[in-house]
């Protein structure tokens, strides 16, 4: 997940605009970070054909493709890109499946119950 240039590019993928805008607002405050948002897999496909990203933050529930399919698509389209899942799902089978998908981490967005499913990799380039 090494930045390709001086700017670290993040793509936030969530079908709830207020969630995406919040994540973008927070991440954009970091020095050297630029963010874009997408609300569906179709938008992701168009964006990733035009430009590269260093990290994708993905909601598992999208209107036109499930997150597992999107992860697979991103691995083939931009294999060097890190992937962080941000989801309301805490079901054991989902966590187990995520742990097999070569992603960088997963975080629950369940309000006061927010917790990490598994540790976000702090070292550039590391994956699970």
For every predicted segment, state its role.
Residues 39-40, 66-69:
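Acidic catalytic/metal-coordinating carboxylates
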Residues 121-128:
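The C-terminal output helix
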Residues 59, 87:
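Active-site residues of response regulator receiver
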Residues 32-40, 47:
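Short hydrophobic/Thr-rich beta-strand motif most characteristic of the beta2 strand and flanking loop
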């Amino acid at each position: 997940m090494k930045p390709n240039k001086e700017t670290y590019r993040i793509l936030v993928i969530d079908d709830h605009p207020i969630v995406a805008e919040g994540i973008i607002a927070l991440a954009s405050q970091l020095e050297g970070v630029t963010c874009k948002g997408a609300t569906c897999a179709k938008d992701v496909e168009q964006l990733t054909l035009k430009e590269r990203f260093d990290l994708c933050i993905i909601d598992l529930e999208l209107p036109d493709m499930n997150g597992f399919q999107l992860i697979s698509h991103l691995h083939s389209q931009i294999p060097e890109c890190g992937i962080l899942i941000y989801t309301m799902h805490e079901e054991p089978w989902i966590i187990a499946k995520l742990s097999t998908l070569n992603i960088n981490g997963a975080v629950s967005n369940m309000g006061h119950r927010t917790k990490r499913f598994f540790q976000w990799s702090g070292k550039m380039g590391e994956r699970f």
